[in-house]
Amino acid sequence: MVXXKTLEPKFFQSLLDNSPTPYHLVNYIEEKLINYFNAQQLKLNEKWKIKTGSYYIKKEGTSLIAFNIDVKKKYEPFLIAAAHTDSPGLKLKIDATEKVSGVFYNHIEVYGSPIISTWIDRDLSLAGIVYFKKNENIESKLINIENIGIIPNLAIHLNRQINEGFKYNAHDNLTVISSTKKAIKDNILEQLGIECENFLSCDLIFTESQPSKIIGTEGEFLASKNLDNKSGCHAIMNSYVHTSNDKNKIAVFFDNEEVGSLTSRGADSNFLSEVLERIDIALDLTREEHLIKTNKSFNISIDSVHGIHPGYTSKHDPNYQANLGKGVVVKNSANFRYATTSTGFAKLKNLAIKNNIKIQEIIMKANVPSGTTIGPISNARTGIETIDIGTPMWAMHSLRETVSIADHIEAIKLLRAFFEKGI
């Protein structure tokens, strides 16, 4: 059994504070895979040769699938855990910068469904990827420029409706002020040492500058940006690298969940099904043997859960509410907004009981619509039995969300048991 030290919150915080975007997160995971397993990268546009060992595949820099294979156990089922790498936010329009009233302000495009008001009056960083030309070749660099700007509120004296449900106009009211001296694009290129004529494109998103913090009188909670769903990504990664390689375990990190997953690097693509099939092709399994194997496999989809808010208890079903500090949550929906079935729930609950892991169940109130996640999409795409779980949080899609450290540890323990023992 792995030492309890690997469950310490500082490792969780390291991922949160060093992964402001999916690009950074995938790089972070890649480094861990190489450090722990000397994992070998495979590419989708090349032939695969697989022997016993650890491998990973990246898709467009923001999605990744890692797998461990023992060729002697090539007929055994896949044990899959999946999460998403993206979070709601404000993407920079790199060439939509204006200078008004002596300051440069930068227009954005809203990604996903953030709680807009939480972005106001916060120290903002800018992170992502920049592509440029060098010696006629296309190169790229990841950036994370801290404290680059702010979206200031209008003073209450000039906006008396600010505390009465004021609605922010995304184009006019969410402009990020960055400087009085130079445009943000010029600042970025200067820091990277790139001439303007060599700039090609970028994918940049504003994030909070403040690092994650352990909070509360007893140090029970962790507040951070991007907990949805970097908490799920960390739980999978921690479990994957700290369990034995006796099983055919697979860690999946999809992008673009927050905008529907319908991209080549999202759950609503052939990425996972293609990787699973190509693994078995490389292992000389027949098509029928591959289908038999996938029908024996199991997928745990982990994403954030709405924790019951003490100030808004009427929003939750009192019999099916998710309490912070009371363990992993199984997500259920009559309309299959989540992939959980009674069969899958029974299997997971049995695994949890055998390993003394606390679990709870959430079903939304009948008059409150349920969200959804990658579970049902991945389930339909692969046909693999899937269950949706997660850890409860407050203020989902806020710039700063809050989770229970104890719940996160329980999620890691559950995934470790799954990777070690199956289901």
From Swiss-Prot:
Gene Ontology MF terms: aminopeptidase activity; metallopeptidase activity; zinc ion binding
The gene coding this protein: apeB
UniProt xrefs under Pfam families: Peptidase_M18
Name of the protein in its database record: Probable M18 family aminopeptidase 2
Example GO BP: proteolysis
PANTHER family: ASPARTYL AMINOPEPTIDASE (PTHR28570:SF3)
Family per similarity comment: Belongs to the peptidase M18 family.
Entry-linked Gene3D superfamilies: Aminopeptidase i, Domain 2, Zn peptidases
Cofactor: Zn(2+)
UniProt source species: Borreliella burgdorferi (strain ATCC 35210 / DSM 4680 / CIP 102532 / B31) (Borrelia burgdorferi)
Disulfide bonds: none
Lineage: Bacteria, Pseudomonadati, Spirochaetota, Spirochaetia, Spirochaetales
EC number in record: 3.4.11.-
Gene Ontology CC: one annotated term: cytosol
Binding site for Zn(2+): H84, H157, H397
Swiss-Prot/TrEMBL keywords: Aminopeptidase, Hydrolase, Metal-binding, Metalloprotease, Protease, Zinc
